């Protein structure tokens, strides 16, 4: 009978268990038949079952829910898979195709409970948007967080990418045909969460935080501020998180594309305006520098599982911005506009943040150093093909002797032409390797120098005829040729006469004996 009573007690609700057990017929029978000892044992058993039922009920309410989802959308190469793999702590991975599935382990340290959060990554090609039906349906919509990923290394694509993928989500949600009442509740919940955001301050409790398991009805009806004119104008009914990846490229944009602080403030202001329209949060991350990766995970579990976080908004660091949903407004965005110098807040995003011109990089051909022996063999073959050349200048082998050089020595001249003394043997000889033109000039120069430097008509000199009329006419007192009587004028006349003689009578030389004229004159 006692066993039957305990089974019945297990099936009843915990609040009514003690009254049913003690006041019912079974309780009266036990109290009257078995005495006080049996009644005391059954009372202890009742208290045990009450504790067990109470603990089970508490655990069922505080247990981490299953079936939560995160949907990532963005362009190809934006870093969607890299971001989730970094959160998981996996360094090496392979990128999926179409619709990729991953998961995040969620652990509640306070309750020692854990679960898995489903992660769906849609391909950057719009061709695959039909696969959203497997990750986002009417049942899982209210348990889903949408993450829009933007590549900050290409900021000129940021705004178009956000608008494109947000419209894809809106189009898919409209196709789900959610009942209007349910959709209205989801939208109101998102508005309520946005309005009730409280920024963590210094007075934030430092004790270990527990998940917020209170229902909406348990919350007090506190007065909230109305939404701004541009806030939640595109309410999807589900939380949205905008993640800007590759923020380490900001320094590259400054160096290579001349971006300044006002450009980054301009980009941030437009992204924050977009986030206001969808009630989204904004986080700047960098997988390369491991910046704000943990913050993304904390924000996900806070939105889906109610985990608290104590991280305030960050807007000072341009590469580590964090703006939770509900913190931002138009006035705070206007603070960025105060730093504009050459830009204006009303400028179009596409006119200011433009795609830089594509630079054609000319890749120089890499020069590979070949083996020394191979190089020497090639060099030897090239040298073998070339004809041998003389070490000096080519020798002029023609039998032509430079014109104007006298060949016949000791010739008699007329009385009015002075005799020419031969060039001494010690004079400079002409190099036979010199060209013909250079040789002729050298011979003439030596010839004229000898005429000007030597005294012509010396006593007993060759080439003077004793019986010439000029000798008789000159008188016998001096015994000198007439050319020596006027030393200042006569040699000049002799030079002209000699030149006339040279031009009238060319000299020929045997080809076998290319002897220089100076040597012939000296012989």
UniProtKB/Swiss-Prot annotation:
InterPro entries: Dynein1_light_intermed_chain, Dynein_light_int_chain, P-loop_NTPase
PTM text: Phosphorylated during mitosis but not in interphase.
Residues bearing the modification Phosphoserine: 207, 398, 405, 412, 419, 421, 427, 487, 510, 516
An example Gene Ontology biological process: early endosome to recycling endosome transport
Subcellular location: Cytoplasm; Chromosome, Centromere, Kinetochore; Cytoplasm, Cytoskeleton, Spindle pole; Recycling endosome membrane
Gene3D superfamilies registered for this protein in UniProt: P-loop containing nucleotide triphosphate hydrolases
Modified residues (Phosphothreonine): 213, 408, 512-513, 515
UniProt keyword list: ATP-binding, Cell cycle, Cell division, Centromere, Chromosome, Cytoplasm, Cytoskeleton, Dynein, Endosome, Host-virus interaction, Kinetochore, Membrane, Microtubule, Mitosis, Motor protein, Nucleotide-binding, Phosphoprotein, Transport
Gly residues bias: start-end ranges: 458-478
Record's compositionally biased regions (Basic and acidic residues): 493-503
UniProt region (Disordered), positions on chain: 1-25, 387-434, 456-523
Residues where ATP binds: 74-81
Cellular component annotations (GO), alphabetically ordered: centrosome; cytoplasmic dynein complex; cytosol; endocytic vesicle membrane; ficolin-1-rich granule membrane; kinetochore; membrane; microtubule
Major location category of this protein: cytoplasm
Quaternary state and interactors: Homodimer. The cytoplasmic dynein 1 complex consists of two catalytic heavy chains (HCs) and a number of non-catalytic subunits presented by intermediate chains (ICs), light intermediate chains (LICs) and light chains (LCs); the composition seems to vary in respect to the IC, LIC and LC composition. The heavy chain homodimer serves as a scaffold for the probable homodimeric assembly of the respective non-catalytic subunits. The ICs and LICs bind directly to the HC dimer and the LCs assemble on the IC dimer. Self-associates. (Microbial infection) Interacts with human adenovirus 5 hexon protein; this interaction probably allows virus intracellular transport.
Matches recorded under PANTHER family: CYTOPLASMIC DYNEIN 1 LIGHT INTERMEDIATE CHAIN 1, DYNEIN LIGHT INTERMEDIATE CHAIN
Name of this chain's protein: Cytoplasmic dynein 1 light intermediate chain 1
Organism encoding this protein: Homo sapiens
Species lineage: Eukaryota, Metazoa, Chordata, Craniata, Vertebrata
